[in-house]
Amino acid sequence: MRAAGIDDLTAKQKIIVELYDKFFRKAFPKMTERLGIVYTPVEVVDFIIQSVNDVLQQEFGQTLGSKGVHIIDPFTGTGTFITRLLQSGLISKDELAYKFKNEIHANEIVLLAYYIAAINIEQVFHNIMGGDYVPFEGICLTDTFALYEKDDLVSEVLADNSTRRRKQKKLDIRVIVGNPPFLGAKLLRRGLGNDYVETL
């Protein structure tokens, strides 16, 4: 797969997801199974985001762009849910800078995916808004399952990440989008155990 010359936003996200998915399955098959790493097709991501926005409008009289509606992808992978949210047009350009800075959040436990997601999300935001490059402060390198259970294991090494993590724990998050690691949950139910057992 070659990314050069691809201008379609959906196609770019598909390439990122597929390349990362193939790489991870080949390079780290045990980690892929243990953490339940599964990547969601872009079309499914778009459907979920649109559906969430519809429910917000119908049931709560708000949208994904409404001020005060914090959004999180707790298992962000390469950031597909957040990038597609930014690209969806469901958050107007007038609302986007504020949302990006204050009310959009993402967590990832795998270091490589965390860095890819941060770059991916920042680049998509920059492509939409232009101007100076703005870092995505809403992403945390953390295990969402253990966010409230464990002390921050990397606080001394990644001080900024620890600050974002503490801040996120205080938020009133209203919307969760994403694809949780179902394989990890299946392993727990079968009693095979993994890193999450001690936090349950």
PLM segments and residue spans:
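SAM-dependent methyltransferase catalytic region
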Residues: 2-200
